[in-house]
């Protein structure tokens, strides 16, 4: 597998990005990222750990993010059972972050991206301090070099957004005191509150989910979506990091879209003997097939897609790139 984390620009992609920057958006010529050092990061997820670690060893991103700690039913932080100390020891401690997400276990269920637990924890300074202390203790316990906060759906509630900004300000001070790095993941819709967030923080903006399980068929990102989100990310008071997602989805008329890795998408192409087409506006691949029961439509991002997306960001100075995710991208030779 070719490296998708690369600071070397492909000439063709650079030329394409330059042409687009001039012609596709009236304000593109004015768009410029703040000064920043280059960085590459990839997420390693607990449900695909071995493949993720293997790809991390091949790709060698500068930063690795372990996904993820979440909330027990009582509101305390826990690691998935699959993430043992032995697993975590496979990663270089000096480049690994632990991600924290607002998923909470409730009996046999897991509430995904739940804001109820956040409203309780972030509402008052004392509860924020306790939450921060628990975050730092968990990172110290497993020798992580940094903290990643990935709390989603906060943009839906203005009061929660205000408390989140206070939480990040306080967390920034505590992580600095403990010699821990900090990055904060933001959904594109959260960028409307960019000016309310504290400075001196790395903000990882999700440049994906344009299409997905919530919509009909299409790419995770396209040129217009990337340009628009870059223009919003440039307003952040901290250092923006651009996060792209590989893989894709399989849609049918009767079921919710199913998430696919690149390996799974290519396997479907081979099984049903179909050739994908590459979309001009996103450079994503797409194809359709019939499994004998119903028609399917698949869109996914491959290496060429990711390189194109990165070039769009790098052309205007965004040099910190994260990839969701490592694992499921190794194609048979």
Place the predicted regions along the sequence by residue.
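Short, acidic/polar
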Residues: 45-58, 125-140, 187-194, 302-312
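Substrate-binding surface in catalytic domains of secreted glycosidases
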Residues: 41-43, 73-82, 162-271
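Conserved, mostly hydrophobic/aromatic
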Residues: 64, 149, 203, 242, ...
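Glycan-binding loop/region signatures in secreted carbohydrate-active enzymes
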Residues: 99-117, 246-309
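Bacterial N-terminal signal peptides
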Residues: 13-22
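Active-site groove signature of glycoside hydrolases
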Residues: 132-161, 207-209
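Glycan-recognition patch characteristic of GH18 chitinases/ENGases
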Residues: 29-131
